Swiss-Prot record:
Family of this protein: Belongs to the UPF0337 (CsbD) family.
Entry-linked Pfam families: CsbD
Species this chain originates from: Caulobacter vibrioides (strain ATCC 19089 / CIP 103742 / CB 15) (Caulobacter crescentus)
Name of the protein in question: UPF0337 protein CC_0938
Top-level taxon in the UniProt lineage: Bacteria
Length: 67
């Protein structure tokens, strides 16, 4: 079963956000740190939405299999 595009996009945003945050910390760039933290949070939320979509899809498939 394929993962939802929200899960994939969320994982990408979390990774990019973590990298931005780390570079911001290493260079003392507070703006980049904040942008990275925000992008990580956005990615985490998007990933959770994707997980919920996948769970709903699996339930629908299970119900349809019983019919």
């Amino acid at each position: 079963m394929a993962m939802s595009t929200n899960r994939i996009g969320g994982a990408i945003d979390k990774g990019v956000g973590a990298a931005k945050e780390a570079v911001g910390k290493a260079t003392g760039n507070a703006r980049l740190q904040v942008e990275g933290a925000a992008q990580k949070a956005k990615g985490d939320l998007q990933n959770k939405v994707g997980k919920a979509q996948d769970k709903a899809r699996r339930r629908d498939q299970a119900l349809n299999a019983r019919l």
